Amino acid sequence: MDPAVLMEAIVEEVNCPICMTFLREPVSISCGHTFCHSCLSGLWKLPGESQNLSYTCPLCRAPVKPRKLRPNWQLASVVDKVRLLGFCMEMGLKTDVCDLHKEQLTMFCKEDDMVTCEACKQSPEHEAHSVVPIKDVAWEYKWKLQQALEHLRKEQEEAWKLEVSEKEQAAIWKTQMERRKQSIRWEFEKYRQLLKEKELPCQQAEEEAAAAQASLEQEKGETASKLELRREAIIRQSQVLWSMIVELEERSQRPVRWMLQGIQEALNRSESWTLQQLEPISLELKTDCRVLGLRETLKTFAVDVRLDPDTAYSRLVVSKDRKSVHYGVTQQNLPDNPERFYRYNIVLGSQCISSGRHYWEVEVGDRSEWGLGVCVENVDRKEVVYLSPRYGFWVIRLRKGTEYRAGTDEYPLLPLTVPPHRVGIFLDYEAHDISFYNVTDGASHIFTFPCYPFPGRLLPYFSPCYSIDTNNTTPLTICTLGGEG
């Protein structure tokens, strides 16, 4: 076999399957595969690679216990020898003697970037060049190597951050895409059920559902392809970066004569290398969950919700008709009755809900912060509260002007294209359904809490939050809808 081909085959065997360069601190896992310790540890830290501390081999996907990583010292020794052998073959330095003059290689030609002997210095090829003793430039180039490595390692850190960020963003997008898919299915099913109960035709709703699902699948495929191309580009950059780092590290550890051969060309490549910033991809979902006609159907369950002033935090000002609330300039002198919230800017509705379907809308205007939903009647009103169904709250919130979130244990970010100025809330007590809609853009679906049995009577929940800026002074106002019961 050709020695070069044989060498290439050997190098492949001692490459890490993740970074595609020589194994560094190789560790073997229970399935028998071997990786760089840093590559494996870094991969398992990325979002989505481990769920509930369940890890898998990147190659065969066999389950692996992360604490069972075994250092492979014998393979590490083999890798070092292969590195040295490959370096010698690449540099073409079989001995320390000049092939032409049979003299020791003791000089370095800066222009030609190569080691020479004393006789070469006098030859026509080098007579006008700066040819200096190796010992005079050894430390200079070792220092340059370290500077170049420092630069590349900083770029490597940025590349790693980019890869982690990309993986996190892709994971968030996949979660949002799955939620949108579920929302479309559930909302159209809800609408079909309501139409059937009213003995109205469902064909148009079924056609709209199929069109929405097809649109979402097309969007999913297009975005997934863009993400994959971007991921491959990031990996290619990382691999080039890794190979340059490995090359310079190898040089820094070799005898001076071998270190200097071709060093300037390697330094030039590393010093000019910078991480390329890729064109950003929009991960904003374009396919809305909007059911035409649903709002008109929900309005048939409209109720006349009014605020209960006895529950309002002392800084909240409730209007005389009990239909709006805003954060007051000063604290009011109000009795600390058991119903009143002591710590938080919360006020509840006065009507308890223990059965049936109910719908109401709230004008939030251009406020930068608010909270809406329902809570159980017996929530703690004096101590710290946690806005989660686990603690009796089904609430969505706006924070910092653009951050829409649902009050669950995961506290997910809600991707809204159009900021809602009016929010619709639908509660189906028997179906354990509490859903929110953006009335501003035609009643697109905002969020539905996972089906969770209500533990008791419920009350509408309102929070205008603080008037921290000029965009948070508009009152929260309960809207009047036709057909209120």
Swiss-Prot record:
B30.2/SPRY domain residues: 285-483
Sample GO molecular function, one term: ubiquitin-protein transferase activity
Which Gene3D superfamilies has this protein been placed in?
A: 2.60.120.920, Classic Zinc Finger, Zinc/RING finger domain, C3HC4 (zinc finger)
Query: InterPro entries, per this entry?
Result: B30.2/SPRY, B30.2/SPRY_sf, Butyrophylin_SPRY, ConA-like_dom_sf, PRY, SPRY_dom, TRIM/RBCC, TRIM68_RING-HC
PROSITE patterns (alphabetical): B302_SPRY, ZF_BBOX, ZF_RING_1, ZF_RING_2
Q: Domain remarks in the entry? A: The RING domain is essential for ubiquitin E3 ligase activity.
Q: Which organism is it from?
A: Mus musculus (Mouse)
**What protein am I looking at?**
E3 ubiquitin-protein ligase TRIM68
Q: Which UniProt keywords apply?
A: Coiled coil, Cytoplasm, Metal-binding, Nucleus, Transferase, Ubl conjugation, Ubl conjugation pathway, Zinc, Zinc-finger
